[in-house]
Design a protein with these regions (language model features):
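Extracytoplasmic gate region of multi-pass secondary transporters
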Residues: 15-44, 83-129
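Cytoplasmic membrane-interface "Motif A"-like loop-to-helix N-cap segments
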Residues: 144-158
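A late C-terminal transmembrane helix in Major Facilitator Superfamily
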Residues: 211-245
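Juxtamembrane intracellular "pre-TM" segments in multi-pass secondary transporters
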Residues: 1-27, 41, 50-88
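A membrane-interface helix-boundary motif in multi-pass transporters
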Residues: 29-46, 237-264
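C-terminal ends and interior cores of transmembrane alpha-helices
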Residues: 158-177
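Residue-level signature of mid-helix packing/kink "hotspots" within the transmembrane helices
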Residues: 129-137, 230
Length: 264
């Protein structure tokens, strides 16, 4: 468990562990819906998630037992605010979580929006991940050079939202021909730059929270990216059904749900 320096932060840490158990439970539910978990194994999976949460909570209590019973009081210069960690975790849900989700659905997006072969759609979708080679270290560099890391992270997060909004405008018929595909690829790479620069700027802040527990903080922030990815992908898997596509949605419904997903 992560060491915190106040009772308030202790309860904050407990609270920020709840989404881990919640998203694992949702994942179990989805696996049961698709038939991977049976009616007998589904309850076992939920019990395992509950057992993990209890074990994790006990680890937090054990690490901070001296703080809880009042035998250890941290001096002001040794304290840090857990809300800084929580902000980084929530930011990483937005950037890295959305990256994992978008990478998973982009081939389908290009395939059904432009009626492309699967191989070509996959190649075009790879441009989103390719930008990572430059964008993620650039995010950290920009954060260092500007000197105001919080504002940099906020600006890149807003750019991320604007980029996804632009991508949601790419629908069948709105961008056509080779020029339309090139425009879609350009918008994809532009959006990817903000997403992955945001990831770099987020982790540029991690070592500044508390040096003694930097590794644990980095682990928690990174794990929240997976929470975001599973959340977004669950929404993505349900969008065709919500849009009236039923269990076997048409290509038109899939294309429409792909565009709508970027607005999420």
């Amino acid at each position: 468990g992560l060491e915190v320096t106040s009772i308030r932060d202790f309860w904050g840490l407990i609270g920020m562990n709840v989404p881990f158990a919640a998203i694992l439970s949702v994942l179990c539910w989805r696996l049961q819906k698709v038939g991977f978990l049976t009616s007998s194994t589904y309850p076992i999976a939920l019990i395992a998630v509950l057992a993990w949460f209890i074990f994790q909570t006990w680890g937090i209590i054990r690490t901070n037992i001296e703080l809880l019973n009042g035998t250890k009081i941290y001096p002001k210069e040794d304290r840090y605010e857990f809300k800084q960690v929580a902000i980084l975790e929530l930011t990483y849900i937005v950037n890295f979580g959305s990256e994992l989700a978008v990478v998973s659905m982009l081939p389908s997006f290009f395939e059904f929006t432009f009626d492309l072969p699967k191989a070509v759609a996959g190649i075009l979708a790879s441009c989103y991940a390719f930008v990572n080679l430059i964008a993620r270290p650039a995010g950290g560099l920009i954060s260092d050079r500007t000197g105001n890391r919080k504002n940099t992270m906020g600006f890149l997060t807003m750019g991320l939202g604007f980029g996804y909004l632009l991508m949601s405008l790419i629908k069948p018929g709105t961008f056509t021909g080779s020029a339309g595909i090139l425009m879609a690829v350009f918008l994809t790479m532009l959006c990817s730059f903000f997403v992955q620069s945001g990831e770099g700027s987020t982790f540029a802040l991690v070592p500044l929270v508390k040096k003694r527990v930097t590794g644990q903080i980095a682990g928690l922030v990174g794990a929240y990216g997976n929470v975001g990815a599973v959340t977004y992908l669950n929404i993505y898997s349900l969008l065709p059904l919500w849009m009236g596509g039923g269990k076997d949605p048409s290509p038109e419904i899939i294309a429409a749900s792909n565009s709508a997903f970027f607005q999420v």
